[in-house]
């Protein structure tokens, strides 16, 4: 993180803290749903727990953004009283690594919507493998597991990838991300649009 700007670190930290609160709220909501419909009820909302990794990576576009943001969010969640306790930090690392692996595959150079959705799906796969070995998912039938995985993949793509991009773009339009990678990209797009309009 030596090449990171102070503004990048501050904004990433603030966003991670905000989403830590969101994560905790969804944890309680998910527990209610699971109590009513079983563990599969978590899957449609699972992608929300990956969103900060996509937002941070998309805004900053530097190695480690996806992973570090998830770790910060998990640490704050732990302090706020997540039912999983310190294990939520391990979960955050797993989820962050899943997203980071996708950006690594592009050498941190591609941040299109498909890549962001794949990052959400990467977290889905990583977290699902974790759940198989740690959360007792291995006890479920193969068919049930397949349905859970498919739903989680879709949730990761939509709630982390698509929604994460929408949130980031909205922040960029406010000007708060000026000087950061996404803010610079938006500035260039506006300049090109202005030049095109003047022709």
UniProtKB/Swiss-Prot annotation:
Organism encoding this protein: Bacillus subtilis (strain 168)
Known role: Part of the ABC transporter complex YkoCDEF that could transport hydroxymethylpyrimidine (HMP) and/or thiamine. Could also transport other HMP-containing products. Probably responsible for the translocation of the substrate across the membrane.
Membrane topology field: Multi-pass membrane protein
Subcellular localization, as worded in the UniProt entry: Cell membrane
Keywords, sorted A to Z: Cell membrane, Membrane, Transmembrane, Transmembrane helix, Transport
Assembly information from the UniProt record: The complex is composed of two ATP-binding proteins (YkoD), two transmembrane proteins (YkoC and YkoE) and a solute-binding protein (YkoF).
Cellular component terms per the entry's GO annotation: plasma membrane
Superkingdom per UniProt: Bacteria
Residue ranges the record marks as coiled coil: none
Gene: ykoE
Protein name per the record: Putative HMP/thiamine permease protein YkoE
InterPro entries: ABC_thiamin-permease_prd
Transmembrane residue ranges: 9-29, 40-60, 63-83, 85-105, 114-134, 143-163
């Amino acid at each position: 993180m030596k090449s990171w700007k102070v503004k990048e670190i501050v904004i990433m930290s603030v966003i991670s803290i905000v989403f830590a609160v969101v994560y905790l709220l969804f944890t309680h909501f998910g527990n209610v749903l699971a109590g009513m419909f079983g563990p599969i009820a978590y899957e449609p909302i699972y992608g929300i727990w990956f969103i900060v990794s996509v937002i941070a990576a998309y805004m900053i576009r530097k190695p480690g953004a996806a992973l570090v943001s998830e770790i910060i969010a998990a640490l704050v969640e732990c302090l706020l009283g997540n039912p999983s306790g310190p294990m939520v930090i391990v979960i955050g690392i797993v989820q962050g690594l899943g997203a980071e692996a996708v950006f690594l595959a592009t050498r941190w150079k591609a941040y299109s919507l498909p890549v962001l959705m794949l990052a959400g799906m990467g977290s889905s796969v990583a977290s699902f493998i974790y759940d198989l070995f740690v959360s007792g998912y291995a006890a479920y039938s193969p068919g049930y597991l397949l349905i859970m995985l498919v739903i989680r993949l879709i949730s990761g793509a939509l709630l982390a990838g698509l929604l994460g991009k929408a949130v980031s773009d909205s922040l960029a339009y406010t000007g708060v991300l000026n000087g950061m990678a996404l803010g610079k990209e938006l500035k260039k797009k506006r300049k090109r649009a202005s030049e095109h309009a003047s022709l």
